Amino acid sequence: MGLPPLEFSDCYLDSPQFRERLKSHETELDKTNKFIKELIKDGKSLVAAHKSLSFAKRKFAGSLNEFKFRCIGDAETDDEICIARSLQEFAAVLGNLEDERIRMIDNAGEVLITPLEKFRKEQISAAKEVKKKYDKETEKYCGMLEKHMNLSSKKKEVLLHEADVQLDQMRQHFYEVSLEYVLKVHEVQERKMFEFVEPLLAFLQGLFTFYHHGYELAKDFSDFKTQLSISIQNTRDRFEGTRSEVESLMKKMKENPHEHLALSPFTMEGYLYVQEKRHFGTSWVKHYCTYQRETKQMTMVPFDQKSGGKVGEEELVQLKSCIRRKTESIEKRFCFDVEGVDRPTVLTMQALSEEDRKLWMEAMDGREPVYNSNKDSQSEGTAQLDNIGFSIIRKCIQAIETRGINEQGLYRIVGVNSRVQKLLNILMDPKISPETETEIPSEWEIKTITSSLKTYLRMLPGPLMTYQFQRSFIKAAKQESQESRIKEIHCLIHRLPEKNRQMLHLLMTHLANVAAHHKQNLMTVANLGVVFGPTLLRPQEETVAAIMDIKFQNIVVEIIIENYEEMFSTVPEMPQTNSQLHLSRKRSTDSKPPSCSERPLTLFHTSHSSEKEEKRNSVNSSAESVSSSNANSSVNSTCTQRSNMNNLNASDPDLDVAKVSRPNSLLNPKNISGLLPSSLNPSPTSPPTCPMVSAPSSPMPTSSTSSDSSPVSVPRKAKALYACKAEHDSELSFSAGTVFENVCPSQEPGWLEGTLNGKTGLIPENYVEFL
C-alpha cells in the first residue's frame, strides 16, 4: 500500500487523520534519509577499500535489495513499477560481480556520492527545516487559540474584536505554513523517484566501463537500463507537470479555501472545546468532532495538534437536541448545549467562532439554523452533445484532416484565445443550422481549430467519459496486465450514455488517424493521451489525488486510440442480470443520502395547468428522453441503451450512489444521423431488441395508447427519504418522512412531479421511494 496523498484542504481541518498521514510521510523521509546516508557510506567504502571490494559490494547490494519504494497513491504506473524494481535489479547485477576483483572507480564520487549528498542536503534537510517551522507555528497557534478561548465575554468589545483579529492573522499564517510544508513533503517524495535512482544508474554505467569481465552481463542489462531511463525521464516529466498543477491548486486554496474543501461524508466536522466537570471546578478539553445528520450521531475524539499530541479514545453521542447557550449564562463565548439520547447530563461545547457555532447548530438542527448559501461549484457550460455539438466537432475534424493532418505539434500548439472564442461563437450560433455542412474557411489556422475542438469538449457540463465512470476508467488503467486494461475499458465505453459513446467514437477515430501520421506531425499515441486525458476524464473536484491520477487518464486515452476499432465495433460480454443490478442499486441507494452534487439540475419550469398535465408523457428516469416522432427508431435506440444499462456490473463503486448530473439534450435519431458511420446510427426499420421497462428505482405500471407508443405512468404515492430545501419556485421543500400524492415522472430527467399540501412541484427522484 502506498503513502496516502496529503490534501491541501486537510490543512484547514487539521484533523487527527491528517496528522497521522503527515507523520507517515515524515517517517518515510526519515527512512529515506537514513538509507541515503548508509548508501553513501557504503559507496565510499567501495571506492576506498580495493582489498575489501567483494565484501563492500555484497553489503551495498544487500542495502539496495532491502529498500522498497513507496509511491503516493493506491496504484503504480508501469514507469513507477520499473523504478521501484530497479534497486532489486541493481542488487542482482552487483551480486553476480561480487567474486570479481576490479580496480577502484575513479569517478564514483562524482556520479554517485555527490548527487546523493546533494539530494539529502538540499531536499530532505530542507523538508526538515520546514517541519521545524511548521511545528513551531503549531505551538504558537494552539497556544494563542487556547488563550483566546479563555477570554471572558464580559471584556470590552474593542478588546475582544482586537483579539479576534489577532487570532485570524495567526490562523492564516498557520494555514500558509501548513500548506507550504505539505507541498514540500510532496515535492521531496516525488523527487526521490528520479534524483535518487538516477545517480545509481550512472554509477552502474561507470562500473560497466571498467568491467571487461562483466561485458556480457552489461549487454544483458542494457534492455532494462533503457527501460529504466525512459521511466525516469517519464517520471521527471510528469513531476514537472504535476508540480505546476499542485502549486496552482495550492494558490487557489490560499485564495478561496472554503470553495475547494474536499467532499466529506459528514454534515459537519471540526474542533470543539468540551466542558468536563472535575472534582475542583471544570476544564475545557479540545476534541475533534464529526456529525452526521442522517443518523444523528456525533463522534468526539480528544486531540491536541501540539507536538507529541496523542489521539484519545473515540466517544459516540446519539443526538437528542441542540440548544444555543445564552451569553449571560456562561463566561465562555460561542457555546451551545448538546443533549444525548443515552446521556444523563448535557454536554456544553464551545465553537471556535460565532460563525462556527452557527454552522454546528444548523447541522444539528439547533434553534438558530443558518441556511447554507454555498452554491454548486460546478460551472455549467453552454456546450451540449446535441446536433450543434456533433456538427462543430465534425467540421473541426474535417478541416484538420483535410488541411493540417501533417502539421507538427498538432493539438500541442495552442491557438490565440480570442480567435478560438470567435470561431466557437460562429460555430455555436443557433441561427446557423447544424445540418449545414459548410466547411470552416481556410482563413482559420489549424491551431485555432484544434484549440476550438478541445475547448468545446471542456465546455461540456461534464467530461465526455462522465463523472460517473471517471473513477472506473482510472481503476481500469491500474490493472496489472494490458489485456485486463483493454477488456475493462471496453466494457466501460459501452456503459457510457449513447451520445457520449458516439462522440467518443467520432473523436477516437480522428485521433487514431492523427497518430497514424505521427512521423509527420510528431503526435504519437502517447502525446495525444497527454493532450486529451485531462479533458476527457477531468475529475469532479480538484484535489492532489486527482492530479496524481492524470498519468492514468493519459493511459486510458492511449488504450482507446490504439484499440478504437475493437472498442467501438464489438460489444463486450456483460453477464450481469437485471435483477442483480436492481438489487445492487437499491441497496447502495438506501445506504446514504444523495449529496449536493447528486441532485439533478432543473431544466424545465413546471406548469401546474391541467392542460399540460394531461399532455405530459412519462419519461424513464434511467435513460435519456427519446423523441416519439420516429417510433421505430426511438424504441430501437432506447432498447439498445437500456440493454447496456441492464448489463452493468453491480459491483462497480461508481454505481453505489445514483448520481444525476445535468441531462444531455434529447436524443433524437434524426438529429444524429450522418454524424457517425452508418454502423452507429440506429436502423429505422429494425424491430426493438428489448421490451420497454421502467427504471429500477421507480417501477410503475405502463399502458399504451393509440396516439403514443411511450408508456403512460399511473400517479402513485411516495415517501421522502431525506430532507430537501427548494432552490427554485417549481420545486417542493420537504422533510424526511413526508408523503407525496400523485407522484409521476416529469419532463426533466432525474425529477418526479408530486403534490404536497395542495401544491404541485418537482421532487428529486433519488430523494424518495414509492409506497
Curated annotation (Swiss-Prot):
GO terms for biological process: signal transduction. It comes from the Eukaryota. GO terms for molecular function: GTPase activator activity. InterPro entries: AH/BAR_dom_sf (IPR027267), BAR_dom (IPR004148), GRAF_BAR (IPR035483), GRAF_fam (IPR047234), GRAF_SH3 (IPR035481), PH-like_dom_sf (IPR011993), PH_domain (IPR001849), PH_GRAF (IPR047225). Gene3D superfamilies: Arfaptin homology (AH) domain/BAR domain (1.20.1270.60), Pleckstrin-homology domain (PH domain)/Phosphotyrosine-binding domain (PTB) (2.30.29.30), Rho GTPase activation protein (1.10.555.10), SH3 Domains (2.30.30.40). The lineage of its organism: Eukaryota, Metazoa, Chordata, Craniata, Vertebrata. This is Rho GTPase-activating protein 26. GO terms for cellular component: cytoskeleton; cytosol; endosome membrane; focal adhesion.
